[in-house]
């Protein structure tokens, strides 16, 4: 399949513009401690015109959230290999920072940055992995029902990717990709509990080896409805048009066609649901179901269809946070086949993922964290199958103002 460029997979239903770990602080809300003086002042001043005005402290111009995480663990398949697995202990560090400007009149601004580095202590082929992600977003509200946002995202990835896109050469490789994506989002709050959003973006990916350099255009439409009793649902359609700088088309038999240019179009349809319940809503559950149809501009050699489901559960008892994410995906290729003979089987690929994360707050700023991640890919072509297990244990420091 094509190596897919960076695409934000939004699982949250209301906003989902930042990673899952930062969904809660994405919106600037007036705390209860600041709301109480307002109520008290209005009560005391009713009928007392001569009473002195209550001084209400102004909100700070900027809100800041920062965290640093350090973990140690073990990964049993660094190269995503079906044989000859390379295993290693690992050390990983992650830093995050979120800046939000207090809305002034109709404008608001936020920026989020995340950096992550992994060192494999016994790695031979792969010694290090790293990634960096930066997003800035400027918002403008011309009216109470309209919001225009312009996010700009830059990213860098240096890691092992699965490049199993042909049956001629199925492999994994260490790739370095630098990219950026930018484009406007226009949201219409047509009801107090529903909104409609249209978005467009342009994306550029540059690889260290130049193998998959190209441009991608995005266009999408999303609908979200907040129901009663903590229920929320949504649906969306997203289209992506990708043009490679140097990749060429393939014939139906898997041969390169010199002098051609490869392009593709992906249409993705999704349905999402979420629910919060309990006192102070410690329980959260989400579910996303999607279908993707990919077509190339040549013989259809890279045509494929994907079905994916993503359940997610979160529980926040006092001092704890437990998060479970799972995903299952099936990929069916239209022309690519496996085996030899007069009637070879169409190529099929199944992928499964599960991730468990546990956090225990030890103090206002410190937390202990542990996690386990499992990934499995199965295909009727054995060389494209692999399994990965990763366990982590460490600490997290966070600060906000």
Model regions: which residues?
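Cleavable N-terminal export/targeting peptides
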Residues: 1-60, 400-401
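Gram-negative and organellar
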Residues: 46-401
């Amino acid at each position: 399949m094509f190596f897919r460029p960076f695409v934000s997979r939004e699982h949250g239903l209301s906003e989902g513009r930042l990673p899952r770990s930062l969904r809660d602080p994405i919106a600037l809300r007036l705390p209860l401690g600041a709301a109480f003086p307002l109520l008290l002042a209005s009560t005391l001043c009713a009928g007392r015109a001569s009473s002195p005005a209550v001084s209400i402290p102004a909100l700070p111009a900027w809100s800041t959230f920062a965290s640093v995480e350090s973990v140690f663990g073990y990964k049993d398949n660094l190269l995503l290999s079906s044989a000859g697995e390379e295993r290693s202990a690992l050390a990983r560090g992650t830093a995050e920072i979120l800046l939000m400007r207090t809305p002034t009149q109709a404008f608001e601004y936020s920026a989020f940055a995340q950096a992550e580095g992994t060192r494999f202590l016994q790695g031979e082929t792969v010694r290090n992995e790293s990634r960096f992600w930066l997003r800035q977003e400027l918002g403008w509200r011309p009216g109470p029902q309209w919001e225009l946002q312009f996010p700009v995202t830059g990213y860098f990835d240096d890691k092992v990717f699965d490049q199993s896109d042909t049956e001629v050469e199925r492999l994994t490789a260490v790739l370095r990709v630098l990219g950026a994506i930018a484009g406007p989002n226009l949201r219409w709050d047509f009801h107090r509990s529903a909104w409609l959003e249209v978005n467009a973006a342009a994306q550029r990916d540059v690889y260290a080896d130049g193998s998959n350099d190209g441009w991608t255009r995005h266009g999408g439409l999303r609908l979200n409805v907040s129901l009663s009793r903590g229920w929320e649902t949504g649906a969306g359609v997203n289209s992506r048009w990708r043009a490679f700088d140097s990749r060429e088309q393939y014939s139906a038999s898997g041969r390169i066609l010199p002098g051609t240019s490869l392009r593709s179009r992906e249409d993705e349809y999704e349905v999402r649901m979420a629910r919060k319940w309990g006192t102070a809503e410690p329980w959260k559950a989400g579910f996303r179901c999607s279908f993707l149809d990919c077509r190339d501009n040549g013989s259809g050699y890279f045509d494929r269809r994907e079905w994916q489901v993503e359940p997610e559960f979160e529980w926040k008892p006092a001092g704890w946070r437990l998060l479970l994410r799972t995903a299952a995906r099936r990929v069916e290729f239209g022309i690519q086949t496996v085996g030899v003979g007069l009637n070879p089987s169409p190529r099929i690929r199944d992928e499964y993922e599960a991730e468990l994360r546990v956090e225990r707050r030890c103090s206002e700023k410190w937390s202990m964290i542990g996690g386990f991640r499992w990934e499995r890919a199965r295909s009727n072509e054995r060389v494209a199958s692999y399994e990965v297990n990763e366990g982590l244990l460490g600490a997290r420091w966070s600060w906000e103002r």
